[in-house]
């Protein structure tokens, strides 16, 4: 049985312990100590890393009451070693874990949402809820959670006796038996084996970075503490850059983007009208009944499609339009009424390092090799 120093004081960074055993295992050595401050992976929280004497601690696991440290070099059974945690990593895990408890508690109190999944990953914490939530509900829960952070109240970790536990209202993902460790933080009470901060104020900030519907509920990406500060600072830097690019005053990004979006829609409509005019002019000049291959300068993929379809409708014959595209040529290939150009498209791609495809009546793609004259000769031979 390993004495768990982190359960008594989660701020222990350095300690001494006696090596109980050391066994070679794949990837290192399995070391058991009589006592440890290293937290083993579990409950969504990653394990601690650091050093035991001259050995690096690579991973920490538990199989009940015994905690095993995987090290890169062996230790000697019976020797006394000094343990040292990677403190910045542990402090980060504590900020994320305590922050998650506070936010989960707010979601539960306000909307009855259960936390059904939790993992401290990188760069964000993943939280899964049992029910769908709106953006407004998430914002409300985030605000309440940060109010609890600002209140800077104590975080209490304890193991109540069975009678006290029976009359205590607490959150838990599963039914528990035996000793149950509870963590009270920011008005929330939850069963938890992890390490936590001493006060809610040490969390600093809780920020929901993104959210999406997942299964029957929501999946949230959350940042707490330094991670939240870094995320907000990064978002603010992007926002400042957008203000400058749009020549928009501070605080007016949304109206500027709406103007940009409306202007883009107007330009797209104007471009479509011009491409229709071009398509009609090209169709007017086309010879009825004859396959056509022509160069259309300045047209995008949609423009090439419009011209090819207009000519085919006029001539009742297949037509291929080509124009500049990336490092080569872009093409749009329209079949005569009732025709199928898929085999021609396949052969064209094979001959000129092309990519693309489509339906029997129309195919579209790009060619990495071949000049317009070469492709034109190939197509006229294939379409005739």
Please provide the spans of the model-predicted regions.
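Conserved nucleotide-binding/hydrolysis modules and their immediate coupling elements
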Residues: 1-79
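A generic structural motif
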Residues: 30-31, 64-73, 125-131, 331-332, ...
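Short flexible coil/turn linkers enriched for glycine and charged/polar residues
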Residues: 13, 25-27, 64-65, 75-77, ...
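Short, hydrophobic/aliphatic alpha-helical segments
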Residues: 21-37, 79-90, 175-187, 337-355, ...
